[in-house]
Design a protein with these regions (language model features):
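Pre-Walker A (Motif I) flank of P-loop NTPase domains
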Residues: 1-4, 67-68
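Hydrophobic anchor at the beta1->P-loop junction of P-loop NTPases
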Residues: 6-8
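Conserved glycine(s) of the Walker
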Residues: 13
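Conserved substrate/cofactor phosphate-moiety recognition/catalytic segment
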Residues: 16-63
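Glycine-rich phosphate-binding loop used to anchor ATP phosphates in small-molecule kinases
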Residues: 50-106
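Short, amphipathic alpha-helical "lid/cap" segments that border enzyme active or binding sites
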Residues: 55, 59, 166-174
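Switch/connector loops and helix/strand junctions flanking conserved nucleotide-binding motifs
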Residues: 106-113
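Small-molecule kinase domains that catalyze NTP-dependent phosphoryl transfer to phosphate-bearing small molecules
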Residues: 119-169
Length: 179
């Protein structure tokens, strides 16, 4: 089964590109906030342990299906060894892994942070001031862009999508990896 792992900083467009990629492939989208938002709603706070358990169940059950594969989006802090461990653990469950790193200028990401699609799918981002501050803090406190040679996957593509529409980026991914 295939895994297309879409990584990048906050509001870079991981979910939106994943949505577009799902439209043009037989892959299913599992974006990071599909587990985060219900947990915040139910527990009234972020609970990483519960989010992780739910993700694990989704992966376990999805791998039992006859789907072609999954698009999974996640923010990877390259200065956090635990993030690398998690990404490798997820990737190990799949037969084929394709890693796409999206990068975009901070000014563009701050604008994307306010888009209707993002706010419709991610209730935790609707307090725009708090969401913007989280985005800036994440960037200040973590390295969210890989260094050359740091991505441990043979099938890797970095795309600067600062000026690219999500459907164009999805087409680039599909073409590069013959999805």
């Amino acid at each position: 089964m295939k895994l297309v792992l879409i990584i990048g900083s906050g509001a870079v467009g991981k979910m939106t590109v994943g949505q577009e990629l799902m439209k043009i492939t037989d892959l299913r989208l599992f974006h990071n906030h599909m587990m985060i938002e219900p947990v915040i709603e139910i527990f009234n706070s972020f609970n990483g342990k519960v989010i992780q358990r739910l993700r694990d169940v989704v992966f376990e059950e999805f791998l039992k299906t006859d789907n072609e594969g999954m698009i999974f989006t996640v923010m990877w802090a390259f200065d956090m060894p635990s993030d690398l461990e998690y990404v490798l653990e997820v990737a190990s469950k799949f037969d084929e892994v394709y890693c796409v790193e999206l990068i975009a200028d901070q000014s563009v990401r701050l604008e994307r942070n306010k888009t209707g699609n993002r706010l419709a799918n991610k209730a935790s981002k609707r307090d725009l001031a708090a969401s913007e501050q989280r985005l800036l803090n994440e960037e200040a406190n973590h390295r969210l862009v890989s260094l050359p040679g740091e991505i441990p996957f043979e099938n890797y593509l970095r795309i600067d999508n600062t000026l690219l529409a999500p459907d164009v980026v999805a087409s680039m991914i599909k073409e590069k990896f013959s999805l």
